[in-house]
């Protein structure tokens, strides 16, 4: 019996340590500057796509989701998808400062991942931030393991660049929607850090 108690104690301690590690929220020195867009998440750049018609999409777990935010990006936009592993810090931060003009939450499906013949839908949040005449978007996409993403902001709120805006649990993705008049400064496979890595710079010919 003592052997089982020891095993149980080790398992509980391991789970507790993992939980504390997963929910860690380390202090960050936020990168400052004008005409830049910061990464909203820690992770690895998974894809970079350009949409000429301004109607962007995001991709997760084999699914493609149209975001229906083309009214904010009439001249086209880039979408940078950032994969967040369970070992990454999962706190999301604002890529720019500005005012929250749009938030939309889409519920995910709660069917078991192994069930066939059922459309599996990732829970996600879409956030649009306005700064001057420009808009930048952040999309939280939860994985099927946890299916949980939440925001600590609301529409109409003014936020600062690098401010914490929410969190996603376990394996997940954060995407950022960037106006077409910016140059992307990261590459697929590159590591990025929320509030610190510059992922786009406004072109000077505009």
Curated annotation (Swiss-Prot):
Main subcellular location of this protein, as a coarse class: membrane
Active site: 172 (schiff-base intermediate with substrate)
Keyword Ribonucleoprotein (UniProt): no
Record keywords: Cell membrane, Decarboxylase, Lipid biosynthesis, Lipid metabolism, Lyase, Membrane, Phospholipid biosynthesis, Phospholipid metabolism, Pyruvate, Zymogen
Names of required cofactors: pyruvate
EC number: 4.1.1.-
Site note Cleavage (non-hydrolytic), residues: 171-172
Domain of life of the source: Archaea
BP terms from Gene Ontology: phospholipid biosynthetic process
Cofactor note: Binds 1 pyruvoyl group covalently per subunit.
InterPro entries: PS_Dcarbxylase, PSD-A
Compartment(s) of residence: Cell membrane
Enzyme class: lyase
Disulphide connectivity of cysteines: none
Function: Catalyzes the formation of archaetidylethanolamine (PtdEtn) from archaetidylserine (PtdSer).
Protein name listed in UniProt: Putative archaetidylserine decarboxylase proenzyme
Species, as recorded: Methanocaldococcus jannaschii (strain ATCC 43067 / DSM 2661 / JAL-1 / JCM 10045 / NBRC 100440) (Methanococcus jannaschii)
Annotated gene: asd
